[in-house]
């Protein structure tokens, strides 16, 4: 750790610094997390006014009590202030439902409103975006990423085709607080206009050149004043205001690698500006090469190897908490590096790398690799690079100087639109065989959709240059997967327009039922048969037709892409992700998907069947319990075993904030069914083990039920009879016969009255051929009945 980093951490967290020196955290709850030199998130100027949707808050000097916020959608410096940082409540240490943080410091030196931070090539600062949402066109201004060097943060972006490096800073010039923006142009620049501040009173028009430009004092409409100076400004540069009250600097021609520095203070003392201007603007290139280590202390934990009976054991990969940095470990996504280590992100913005994933788990070593990300809940490793999906962007993390920490946080793609709504999480991250990236994005709560990406699956090209909506109509899709054949699966959980949790097989352009998040035109039908046509994601369409978006009396779509399996609340109240079994070392499940319940902390096997062009599925529990809400899964290429990760939040049964687990196949007999079929005469179950014929062919060993759900804008649905529509309850069906195949693995249950239903259940109590008890339940969905079945395979 360099002296500057150590000084920075001590100034930021006096209490934590003592604990860091001691190497322990005996009073972890008494100190705030060590958050690093920057923090990403939506940042509010007040409760009703956003400073930046994709905000980057950078801590500067002044003993860690000076800050700036950038809007990375528009490359605008949104605010600069001193004093307190942001009002987080408990959101740095817990998962709660508050609005985004607001600027806590009261001394805001200057700020600007939502809009472009640089003028376009015609010199205009007029915002071209719809509803001031999303990034500017890439040929206007585009964020490339940021470099971390000790306590400095250097932003990299383009204005038009001009690359720009920017270093924010703060100087205490003999008691005068001065903020600084150092801008460097690696390829030179010509005729660029940069926004400084908004809300200027009166007109400003003056030359602004040389190594001691200004200082010039301007007044804000709210009574504040701001003094601006600069150095390194080329001849012909101007400080001007616009009729809209924006203060800008028009930069004349700059040579390759020229740097300029813009200075800002709430005090008009020219002496402070003169003192700062004596120093030449920094060459920022050395700060892009990596600096000192920020997080020198690794955390060592001891895992717990499962010792339960059965074919699958749960091993616990003990999380790095407590840790010297007092950061929580609500795990959000993970993947494996080529050498077998795992990279895992946390909801509060960290990425850890863990080694020691061997048979015994006796020494797990955790290294804090990155921090400051915007609620990352997905992570994917591609060709050794770590990609992290946050609410603002997919970030590619680069360790420039190979010291074990990320130095360059590259913006791989930030085309997604962000709003302040807490419920629009970005969830999971996967790639297909062509290298395209996929992630899911939640719909808002309340479900008044206000952006084109809420409630969708988004697809990003392998080079990160283009993003598109792959599918829509999602509510809270906490996890998905892309299978070996590029099959896309995604879960969703009960709520408005979601009668129950479910598993979707997703085709391009699919609409999966969450009506306010359709993101396209639909035909909606009222109960009286009246139809209207329009896009329910459009606020104007909703307003014109008085659509609330979550009322049970609202019109429903005439059709939507139904799930391959509904999942009842008692099995899963909040779905996690899915993962395909790709390993030969994990028993009889290779090629099948697995389904995680975040809410119940459980794991299920998925058995799909195809009837004509219709795919439907059934689920069976593994009977394993996890201490956290499992929602991400990957198979390790090193040991062939399943790894799961998850966290504790609302609506789940977790006992630990974060958990990382290995589900290990022991080689013992698996007594679960691994295949199902439904036909006109009944249900066929194929087990992984031989069954005892006597118990298998006893009809009293089974109980079969059917039920439906009601699709509407209401929150969830009761369970309704299929036979008597409108009546709450299940239909109990008679098992007329049970026949076992010659290999003693496949059962045919001849069921009287089996028909198409949202949900069926088969409970069974059997004995395996080796005498083991085989007792569980299968639930599934029947969209279409296949032909008559037999007990033969």
Where are these regions (language model features)?
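Beta-strand-rich N-terminal accessory domains
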Residues: 27-180, 191-217
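Structural beta-strand segments of beta-rich domains
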Residues: 179-181, 681-685, 747
């Amino acid at each position: 750790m360099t002296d500057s980093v150590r000084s920075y951490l001590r100034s930021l967290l006096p209490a934590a610094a003592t604990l860091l020196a001691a190497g322990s955290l005996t009073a972890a709850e008494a100190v705030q997390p060590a958050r690093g030199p920057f923090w990403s998130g939506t940042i509010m100027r007040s409760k009703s006014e956003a400073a930046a949707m994709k905000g980057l808050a950078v801590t500067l000097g002044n003993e860690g009590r000076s800050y700036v916020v950038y809007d990375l959608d528009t490359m605008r410096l949104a605010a600069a202030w001193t004093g307190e940082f942001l009002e987080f409540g408990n959101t740095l240490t817990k998962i709660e439902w508050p609005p985004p943080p607001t600027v806590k410091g009261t001394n805001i030196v200057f700020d600007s409103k939502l809009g472009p931070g640089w003028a376009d090539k015609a010199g205009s600062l007029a915002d071209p975006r719809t509803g001031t949402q999303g990034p500017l066109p890439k040929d206007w201004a585009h964020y490339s990423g940021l470099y971390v060097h000790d306590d400095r943060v250097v932003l990299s972006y383009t204005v038009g085709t001009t690359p720009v490096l920017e270093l924010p800073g703060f100087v205490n010039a003999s008691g005068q607080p001065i903020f600084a923006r150092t801008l460097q142009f690696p390829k030179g620049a010509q005729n660029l206009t940069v926004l400084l501040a908004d809300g200027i009173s009166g007109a400003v028009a003056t030359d602004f050149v040389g190594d001691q430009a200004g200082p010039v004092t301007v007044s804000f409409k709210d009574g504040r004043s701001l003094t601006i100076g600069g150095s390194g400004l080329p001849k012909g540069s101007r400080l001007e205001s616009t009729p809209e009250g924006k203060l800008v600097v028009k930069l004349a021609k700059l040579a390759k690698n020229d740097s300029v520095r813009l200075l800002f203070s709430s005090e008009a003392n020219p002496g402070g500006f003169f003192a700062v201007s004596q120093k030449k603007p920094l060459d920022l290139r050395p700060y892009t090469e990596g600096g000192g280590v920020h997080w020198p202390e690794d955390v060592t934990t001891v895992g717990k190897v499962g010792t339960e009976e059965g074919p699958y054991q749960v091993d616990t990969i003990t999380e790095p908490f407590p840790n010297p940095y007092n950061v929580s470990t609500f795990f959000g996504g993970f993947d494996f590096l080529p050498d077998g280590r795992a990279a895992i992100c946390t909801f509060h913005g960290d990425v850890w790398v863990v080694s020691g994933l061997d048979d015994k788990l006796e020494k797990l070593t955790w290294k804090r690799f990155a921090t400051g990300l915007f609620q990352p809940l997905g992570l994917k490793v591609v060709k050794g690079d770590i990609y992290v999906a946050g609410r603002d962007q997919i970030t590619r993390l680069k360790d420039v100087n190979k010291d074990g920490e990320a130095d360059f946080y590259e913006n791989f793609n930030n085309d997604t639109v962000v709003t302040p709504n807490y419920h629009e999480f970005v969830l999971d991250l996967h790639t297909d065989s062509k290298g395209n990236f996929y992630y899911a994005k939640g719909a808002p709560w309340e479900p008044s959709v206000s952006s084109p990406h809420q409630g969708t699956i988004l697809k990003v090209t392998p080079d990160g240059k283009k993003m598109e909506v792959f599918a829509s109509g999602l509510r809270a899709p906490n996890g998905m997967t892309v299978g070996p054949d590029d099959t896309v699966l995604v879960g969703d959980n009960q709520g408005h327009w979601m009668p129950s949790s479910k598993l979707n097989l997703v085709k391009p352009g699919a609409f999966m039922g969450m009506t306010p998040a359709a993101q396209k035109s639909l035909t909606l039908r009222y109960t009286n048969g009246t139809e209207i046509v329009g896009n329910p994601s459009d606020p104007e369409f909703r307003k014109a037709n008085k659509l609330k978006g979550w009322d049970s009396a609202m019109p429903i779509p005439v059709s939507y892409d139904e799930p391959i399996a509904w999942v009842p609340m008692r099995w899963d109240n909040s779905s996690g992700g899915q993962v395909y079994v790709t390993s030969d070392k994990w028993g009889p499940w290779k090629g099948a998907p697995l389904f995680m319940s975040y809410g119940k902390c459980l794991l299920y096997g998925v058995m799909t069947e195809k009837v004509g062009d219709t795919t439907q599925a059934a689920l069976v529990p593994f009977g394993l319990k996890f201490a956290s809400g499992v929602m991400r899964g990957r198979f390790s290429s090193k040991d062939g075993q399943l790894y799961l990760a998850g966290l504790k939040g609302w609506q789940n049964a977790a006992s630990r904030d974060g958990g990382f687990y290995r589900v290990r196949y022991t080689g013992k007999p698996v007594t679960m069914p691994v295949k199902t079929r439904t036909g006109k005469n009944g249900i066929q179950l194929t087990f992984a083990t031989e069954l005892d014929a006597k118990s298998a062919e006893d009809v009293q060993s089974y109980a079969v039920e059917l039920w439906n759900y009601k699709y509407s804008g209401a929150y969830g649905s009761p369970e309704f009879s299929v036979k008597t529509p409108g009546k709450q309850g299940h239909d109990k069906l008679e098992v007329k016969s049970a026949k076992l195949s010659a290999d003693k693995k496949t059962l045919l249950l001849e069921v009287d009255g089996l028909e198409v239903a949202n949900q069926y259940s088969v409970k069974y109590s059997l004995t395996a051929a080796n005498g083991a008890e085989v007792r569980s339940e299968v639930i599934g969905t029947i969209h279409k009945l296949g032909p008559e079945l037999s007990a033969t395979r």
